[in-house]
């Protein structure tokens, strides 16, 4: 289903996790004759899962484990993993905070700058442990931190302007 966005842009409808329900079908498919593999920029994966680039979801260990299982974990280029040498105490603070104190805490935590050295370190850790290093960031961050990631890049995805 296409949606008109502005005067000249048409976009596809996307769905969130709370909008999707899986219901068993009327037909049974033998697992031996199915193929769930997919390819992105020459990287083949066997499980059709891309884990969200959220601090509470993907860290170095999760990215490596997902790679080993055949999926893809994406690290948040602008999250706590690249702002703090040890992000675990920060994540513990986020998990423990109440609703009223959440916004001030996030403002405090995200006031720390992203460290290019941590971007490099996290990518190196993932690759050294045998994982596929994938990162996600805003377009501004992609340009700002390209020197921290470009030497590790093995594929280039086209932008909307190139498509």
Where are these regions (language model features)?
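Active-site entrance/lid segments in N-terminal catalytic domains of soluble metabolic enzymes
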Residues: 1-155, 161
């Amino acid at each position: 289903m296409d949606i008109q966005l502005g005067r000249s842009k048409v976009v596809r409808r996307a769905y969130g996790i709370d909008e999707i329900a899986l219901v068993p079908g009327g037909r049974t498919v033998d697992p031996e004759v199915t193929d769930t593999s997919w390819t992105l920029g020459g990287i083949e994966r066997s499980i059709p899962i891309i884990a969200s680039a959220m601090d509470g979801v993907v860290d170095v260990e999760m990215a490596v484990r997902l790679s080993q299982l055949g999926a893809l974990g994406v690290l948040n280029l602008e999250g706590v993993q690249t702002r703090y040498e040890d992000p675990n105490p920060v994540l513990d603070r986020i998990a423990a905070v109440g609703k009223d104190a959440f916004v001030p805490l996030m403002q405090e935590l995200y006031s720390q700058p992203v460290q290019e050295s941590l971007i490099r370190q996290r990518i190196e850790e993932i690759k050294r442990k045998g994982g596929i290093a994938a990162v996600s960031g805003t377009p501004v961050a992609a340009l700002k931190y390209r020197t921290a990631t470009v030497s590790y890049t093995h594929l280039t995805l086209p932008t909307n302007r190139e498509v």
